[in-house]
Amino acid sequence: MSPVKQRLLRIAVSHNRHPSLSEEQFHQWATKEHCARAARIHSRHGIEAYGMLFSPETARTTVQNLNRQLGGRWKIDEHDVTVEFYLHSLDELTSVLEDPEFKALQQEEEPYVSGEDIVATLGWVETYVQDGRVVNVDSEGVPTYPGFGVLADFSSEQVNQK
């Protein structure tokens, strides 16, 4: 019997840039001044992976065109950036949020990030193709992840204990 896979969570938080900034100015600030500092803090608290998905107007127009070609059923997200955290427990993120260095870094965001219309999503990741290869599927073609009941159980997360 193979060991049970540890669930990998993804929490994504979507933001818009401050209206006084161009997309390029926002990207410059995020990549040159913010991300590397944030990455060191996230790593220190056990975050498995951290990244930012930038979605400028050119990308949104492109996905709108794709959506139109596919029948127009998608709702296109209009946010400028989505911050992605991959972790095994929300305790890791809570630890980051309580870190004084991170709190100071968040204070510096105010002139760059709009505080309006922030959207968050939380779920787990099931990867089936990685590095061009099929993964996490056994020889019978069955996924090797635990069942839904195990994966969907968030009751042990500290935020649900309070």
UniProtKB/Swiss-Prot annotation:
Pfam families linked: EthD
Chain ranges of the EthD domain: 19-113
Molecular-function GO terms, alphabetical: oxidoreductase activity
Keyword annotations of the record: Oxidoreductase
Domain of life: Eukaryota
Induction field: Expression is positively controlled by the cluster-specific regulator ATEG_00326.
Gene3D superfamilies per UniProt: 3.30.70.100
EC number: 1.-.-.-
Function: Putative oxygenase; part of the gene cluster that mediates the biosynthesis of isoflavipucine. The PKS part of the PKS-NRPS ATEG_00325 probably assembles a triketide from an acetyl starter and two malonyl-CoA extender units. The poly-beta-keto intermediate would then be fused to the leucine unit by the NRPS part. The resulting amide would be liberated from the PKS-NRPS through reductive release of the linear PKS-NRPS product from the enzyme complex.
Recorded family membership: Belongs to the tpcK family.
Protein name: Putative oxygenase ATEG_00329
